[in-house]
Swiss-Prot record:
The keyword Metal-binding does not apply. One of its GO terms (cellular component) is small ribosomal subunit. This is Small ribosomal subunit protein bS20. It comes from the Bacteria. The keyword RNA-binding applies. It holds the Pfam family Ribosomal_S20p. It comes from Bacteroides fragilis (strain ATCC 25285 / DSM 2151 / CCUG 4856 / JCM 11019 / LMG 10263 / NCTC 9343 / Onslow / VPI 2553 / EN-2). Binds directly to 16S ribosomal RNA. SUPFAM superfamilies: Ribosomal protein S20. Keywords: Ribonucleoprotein, Ribosomal protein, RNA-binding, rRNA-binding. Belongs to the bacterial ribosomal protein bS20 family.
Length: 84
């Protein structure tokens, strides 16, 4: 256990951030899963901007890497374009 007040506070903050990052990461993964399970092009096209916004925010806050975000957006766009 940490001895300094600032160290104890830092531990508290890190735990809060870790839980928040896990929540947002899981929410993003579920949204991507939902889009990938969709077979309707109109529905997928409507969902795509919201998912892109979510992915970009997570990349900006370093929850996910920026290259992963770009790869994910690209793969989802390809998936939507392949839908008939």
């Amino acid at each position: 256990m940490a001895n300094h007040k600032s160290s104890i506070k830092r531990i508290r903050q890190e735990e809060t951030r870790r839980l928040r990052n896990r929540y947002y990461g899981k929410t993003m993964r579920n949204a991507v899963r939902k889009l990938r399970s969709t077979t309707d092009k109109a529905e997928a096209t409507a969902m795509y901007p919201g998912i892109v916004k979510m992915v970009d925010k997570l990349a900006k806050t370093n929850v996910i890497h920026k290259n992963k975000a770009n790869n994910l957006k690209s793969k989802l766009a390809i998936y939507i374009n392949k839908l008939a």
